Structure formats: structure tokens, C-alpha cells
Design a protein with these regions (language model features):
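Extracellular ligand-binding/catalytic regions of CAZymes and related secreted enzymes
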Residues: 36, 43-46
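Structured N-terminal alpha/beta-domain signature
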Residues: 77-83
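Amphipathic alpha-helical oligomerization segments
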Residues: 2-35, 49-70, 84-87
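A generic structural signal for solvent-exposed, polar alpha-helical segments
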Residues: 46-49, 76
Length: 87
């Protein structure tokens, strides 16, 4: 399985920033990458809220794998952010 060099919170925040800036979503920038690089930090609180919501798997997710592992993985992602001061 590939492993990202970015934290999960940063990846979520970058997606949210991209949606706000990119012409392919809600924004008007045809080349939003630089804006995303500059502004993704503004979306960290939203990303944390999304991740907190995902702590508990739904029934389909629980049936597909180990719910305890899922919860530990999400908590680990949140704890990384606490360690760097974002949570």
C-alpha cells in the first residue's frame, strides 16, 4: 500500500482549498496549485472536523474491515495534528 508523505489532515485541507480555488470546482483559478500551496493552512480546522466525523465507521465500513483498527488510524492522524499544534 502506498504511504503519503503528507499528513491526512493536510491532504484533506488541500482538497478543500483546491475546491475553493480551482475552476474545476467552485473557484475561478485555472491553475490553482500555487494558491492551494499558499492557503491550505486556512482549511485545517475544516479538515480536522471532517476527520473527527470519520472516527466511527459506518456499518458498511465496519463490515469491510476491523473497526478498531480504523478508529486507531483516525485517532493517530488526529494525534499527529495535536503534536504539531493544529488540533
Amino acid at each position: 500500500m502506498p504511504v503519503s508523505n503528507l499528513t491526512l489532515v493536510e491532504r484533506i485541507a488541500r482538497v478543500l482549498a483546491g475546491r475553493a480555488h480551482s475552476i474545476n470546482a467552485e473557484g475561478d483559478d485555472p491553475s490553482a496549485g500555487p494558491n492551494v500551496d499558499e492557503t491550505w493552512h486556512e482549511y485545517v480546522d475544516d479538515a480536522l472536523s471532517i476527520l473527527r466525523t470519520m472516527r466511527e465507521p459506518d456499518p458498511v465500513m465496519a463490515a469491510a474491515g476491523d473497526p478498531d483498527v480504523w478508529e486507531r488510524m483516525v485517532e493517530a492522524a488526529l494525534n499527529v495534528e495535536k503534536a504539531v499544534g493544529n488540533a
